[in-house]
């Protein structure tokens, strides 16, 4: 999950398309990994919180949130993803292997 978020250094209105593409990629990939039993249901649900966080940032950007606030939200999401990586160390590799 952290690799997905590391694609975004600083986000602004021009990031909207890339964020949407990443949300779609995560949604599809996580579903495949869960359906093929490559990740546990718990990992799937927790990873969904990162995808949901990206969706929140996307919605806030479309509502005109400041770049500073968007990047603050992104930083918090990256911290959550690092924690998730500690719990499920194989998750990031499995997600990235599907690109």
Regions found by a protein language model. Give the residues of each.
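Intrinsic-disorder-associated interaction segments
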Residues: 8-19, 43, 50, 63, ...
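Amphipathic alpha-helical binding modules
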Residues: 64-99
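Generic L/I/V-rich hydrophobic alpha-helical segments across diverse proteins
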Residues: 16, 23, 30, 47, ...
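Intrinsically disordered, low-complexity regions
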Residues: 2-8, 13, 54, 74, ...
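General structural signal for alpha-helix termini and helix-helix connectors
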Residues: 32-39, 56-63, 67
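N-terminal acidic leader/helix
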Residues: 2-44, 86
């Amino acid at each position: 999950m952290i690799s997905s978020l590391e694609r975004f250094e600083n986000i602004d209105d021009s990031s909207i398309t890339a964020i949407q593409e990443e949300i779609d990629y995560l949604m599809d990939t996580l579903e495949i990994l869960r359906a093929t039993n490559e990740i546990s249901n718990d990992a799937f649900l927790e990873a969904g919180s990162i995808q949901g966080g990206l969706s929140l940032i996307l919605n806030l950007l479309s509502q005109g949130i400041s770049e500073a606030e968007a990047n603050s939200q992104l930083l918090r999401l990256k911290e959550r993803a690092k924690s998730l990586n500690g719990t499920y160390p194989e998750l990031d590799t499995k997600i990235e292997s599907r690109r």
